[in-house]
Amino acid sequence: MSTSSSKKYKLIGLLFLALYVMTHLGFYKTYFIHFPSFEKFQLLHHVHGFLMSTWILMLITQPLLIGYGKVKLHHFVGGLSYVIAPLLVVSLFLITKMSYNKGVLLSSPREAIADQALSIAQLFTFSGFYAMAMAYRKNAARHMRYIIGTGLLMILPGLNRLLGSFYDTDFNLALVISSVLTIGIAV
């Protein structure tokens, strides 16, 4: 592998490290601050958080392994995704369902489902990106792009919470900022 390619893979790992930090800062006031009691949270919240954190850690690790020439280890960690990704999809579905059920108690079913529209879209988009990444696992360029896509989806929830929690940004404005940033990185 050329030095230029190696640097690119390492840069991708560092970008996902930044995503990890941003996401954890975003969830600090809504989740991590409640440590160790986590009184308002159910086991599902913890499982979902663990799976999402694991996925981002895999996104950090995988390009670094390629960048350092550890291809066999990259394949082993990638094999773990066959367990992690389906569990992550199930946790996304269950978290979305739980949020919908809470929303129905506070508003109409129509409003509750509208509030979950982004989560539903992300569930299907993540599933599609992951499926395509695995279908193209022998084509490094395509595989990498689809896997990166799974990570870009995490900008929205993390940055929305970060902007709302730390800067008191209106939800709609935070959504626009997160979306523009995601699209900008993707392009």
Positions of the model-derived regions?
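Alpha-helical membrane insertion/targeting regions
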Residues: 1-187
